[in-house]
Amino acid sequence: MDILGATLRVYVDDLEKAIPFYEGLAGGRAMRSERGGVEVAAVGCFLLMSGPESQLEVLRKVAATIAVTDVEETLRAITSLGGDVIAGPVPTPAGRNLIARHPDGAIYEYVDRRA
């Protein structure tokens, strides 16, 4: 399993107001999507999220989003090391993801770019 990088989750009240700041900071354009009533904008290493508190409450439990080469390989590594998969793997607009709980209780999202 190769870890390619991590994305910092930022929860904002107003996505439209937040995007210009993070675009300027990261030096890139936001890639937007929507899932389950939550608006998302990926800008560099930041993942901005805005939506209903009931949805954000669940998302806030995830410490970070970690990019990997292959979600299936990651699933095998996590479970063999004593972690468990809470959700997924499922398709996303960019590839696939899963949510896993590590043996210490920390929860992470793992994503790949495979279709």
Predicted regions and their residues:
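N-terminal beta-strand motif that seeds the catalytic metal site of vicinal oxygen chelate
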Residues: 1-19, 62-64, 114-115
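Vicinal oxygen chelate
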Residues: 1, 79-115
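Mid-chain, well-packed structural core segment of small domains
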Residues: 64-87
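Acidic di-acidic motifs
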Residues: 14, 70, 102
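Conserved acetyl-CoA-binding loop of GNAT-fold acetyltransferases
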Residues: 24-31, 82-84
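Conserved active-site tyrosine of GNAT-family acetyltransferases
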Residues: 18-23, 78, 105
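Conserved short beta-strand elements that form part of the metal-binding/catalytic scaffold
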Residues: 28-61, 107-113
